[in-house]
């Protein structure tokens, strides 16, 4: 025959009797040990659950200047570690767990597991590794690149969208992307401004050569007209000086 025995609150005071008397008596928390000590002029109390139980609520309490405990909603529940939780999934444990117990996780249909599919209850009342989550295999709406946009309104598993850029911009990255297990298949693309291409050096040289050629042809034509007119260079120079003087006089 087996009997269950509830272990009532055990209290250990590591402060002077006068300080301890100023703080009110705490309500009992079954299956726990409460240790109080003085820290920087305040009474600090800590709950520790016995083996096979885990803490729910606040672990550490302060007896403040008003000689009141700041919180008393604490309890020790059966099971060495907190009950496992997995939204949109299930796990192998069906009752209170003990130290070193292991559980496995599995997600419901249309959800994918993110994290480890196993976890173990440790001596310090924690699970390791942390519990996973079950994430929908559908995707969240994608973002728009700066100076760009996407086309498509279906974000479910297997659906595709296409990215485009505004006028005078070009796309850098993957244009068409697919929803795969809750994630888009590629990173968000970027829209970059189309820069006017600079003229090549050979084109610049060709332009300079053409201008020089045109200048030479103009000089040859001028010299030919001068020769045909019978005017000498001295007469041309004198004529230009007269024209210059006439223009200057008109400006005055």
UniProtKB/Swiss-Prot annotation:
Compartments where located: Secreted
Glycosylation sites noted in the Swiss-Prot or TrEMBL record: 64, 71, 98, 117, 154
Main location: secreted
One GO CC term, this protein: extracellular region
Residues making up the signal peptide according to the UniProt record: 1-17
Subunit structure of this chain's protein: Disulfide-linked complex of alpha and beta chains of 3 possible sorts: a 570 kDa complex of 7 alpha chains and 1 beta chain, a 530 kDa homoheptamer of alpha chains or a 500 kDa complex of 6 alpha chains and 1 beta chain. The central body of the alpha chain homomer supports tentacles, each with the binding site for C4b at the end.
Function per UniProt: Controls the classical pathway of complement activation. It binds as a cofactor to C3b/C4b inactivator (C3bINA), which then hydrolyzes the complement fragment C4b. It also accelerates the degradation of the C4bC2a complex (C3 convertase) by dissociating the complement fragment C2a. It also interacts with anticoagulant protein S and with serum amyloid P component. The beta chain binds protein S.
Stated name of the protein: C4b-binding protein beta chain
Recorded name of the encoding gene: C4BPB
